[in-house]
Amino acid sequence: STSRRQRQMCIRDRNKIPYKEYTYECDEFVDALKVADTLGQPYELLYKTLVTIGNSRNYFVFVIPIAEELDMKKAAKSVGEKSVSMIHVKDINQVTGYIRGGCTAIGMKKQYVTRIDESAQKLEKMIVSGGRLGVQIELKPEDLKKASRGEFADIIFKQPE
């Protein structure tokens, strides 16, 4: 919604976060890899936002590269939970205020504990959802961390060397 979007922009502005906005035609959920292709951006720069629920019934937000998979054990450990599981797609809006494909760690309904995959620390910039379908924002990983009050953590599956 517009108010959610305005709230995000307020958070970014309040934190004096410079960002670049990308818009593209989109009226339904599309795979994140397709979004990267549409924007002509390398997959490594785009990150998706996943929402989970822990044993404690608390919600947790994880931001990971679009081509990677969340390691549930590492994710749970990073937030001090025994286990976490993905929330049901139908619950995304109720929990976050966003819709599937438009979910971002900035400006959710409530402030949830957020972990950003440590791979983002190596990047100068990253691209995440702008809070609605058809909008992506580019910002520094440190700025996403600040605006989401998140922490960097090792939360994705690693291929055995």
Regions found by a protein language model. Give the residues of each.
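Short, structured active-site "lid" loops
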Residues: 36-60
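Helix-adjacent hinge/juxtasegments
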Residues: 53-91
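Acidic and generally charged, gly/proline-rich low-complexity regions
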Residues: 97-161
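Terminal hydrophobic/aromatic helix or amphipathic segment near a protein terminus
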Residues: 84-104
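N-terminal polybasic phosphate/anion-binding patch
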Residues: 8, 14-38
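Short, solvent-exposed amphipathic alpha-helical segments in soluble enzyme
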Residues: 38, 67-68, 76-81, 131, ...
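Single conserved hydrophobic/aromatic residue that forms the stacking wall/gate
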Residues: 1-11
